[in-house]
Amino acid sequence: MPVADTSQLISGVAERYASSLFELALDAGSIEAVGADLTRIQALIDGSDDLKRLIVSPVFSADDQFKAISALVEKFGFSGLVGNFLKVVARNRRLFVLPGIIKAFRLLAARHKGEITADVTSAHALTLAQEIELKAALKGVTGKDVAVNVTVDPSILGGLIVKVGSRQIDTSLRTKLSTLKLALKEVG
């Protein structure tokens, strides 16, 4: 199966799971709480190589994944809805799409609130003050409330890459250095 087809398949699975979770959260009136739990889960995934391995590796059995996720749910006190959802995802051997589910849920929640979403890549985690300032700047440009999905990528060295819809603003140090390198090649 070509890579494009695989990513579309994963995206479709993630969107279906996210849609189901969103509908359950909407019925329970807990979209904000579920979103907060999903943000905590993403932070756990981003901060733990072992958890990343558990999620993506086909070596772990469904039972091993279920036990690990159940322990995680207990340890971090995820709500009943999110806890049960994670267990279902683990039992169905779909943990590998969990980051996609989280992203799709955020998009659904933002759309429900009339927000637009910006994907932001930063060399380091943003502080709460930086995130608030970024949201305010993006609201000034777009005229709408903006939810931000921050991804940390140390390889950009510094600055930000911001994607809002089809627009991208790249102020990363890596890009600036690449541009300077090209300019120097043209001069010499």
UniProtKB/Swiss-Prot annotation:
One Pfam family of this chain: OSCP
PROSITE patterns in alphabetical order: ATPASE_DELTA
GO molecular function, one term: proton-transporting ATP synthase activity, rotational mechanism
Superkingdom of source: Bacteria
Membrane topology category: Peripheral membrane protein
Protein's cellular compartments: Cell inner membrane
Keywords carried by this UniProt record: ATP synthesis, Cell inner membrane, Cell membrane, CF(1), Hydrogen ion transport, Ion transport, Membrane, Transport
Alphabetical list of InterPro entries matching this protein: ATP_synth_OSCP/delta_N_sf (IPR026015), ATPase_OSCP/d_CS (IPR020781), ATPase_OSCP/dsu (IPR000711)
Cellular component annotations (GO), alphabetically ordered: plasma membrane; proton-transporting ATP synthase complex
Keyword Hydrolase: no
Protein family membership: Belongs to the ATPase delta chain family.
Biological function: F(1)F(0) ATP synthase produces ATP from ADP in the presence of a proton or sodium gradient. F-type ATPases consist of two structural domains, F(1) containing the extramembraneous catalytic core and F(0) containing the membrane proton channel, linked together by a central stalk and a peripheral stalk. During catalysis, ATP synthesis in the catalytic domain of F(1) is coupled via a rotary mechanism of the central stalk subunits to proton translocation.
Assembly description: F-type ATPases have 2 components, F(1) - the catalytic core - and F(0) - the membrane proton channel. F(1) has five subunits: alpha(3), beta(3), gamma(1), delta(1), epsilon(1). F(0) has three main subunits: a(1), b(2) and c(10-14). The alpha and beta chains form an alternating ring which encloses part of the gamma chain. F(1) is attached to F(0) by a central stalk formed by the gamma and epsilon chains, while a peripheral stalk is formed by the delta and b chains.
Protein name: ATP synthase subunit delta
Annotated source species: Rhizobium meliloti (strain 1021)
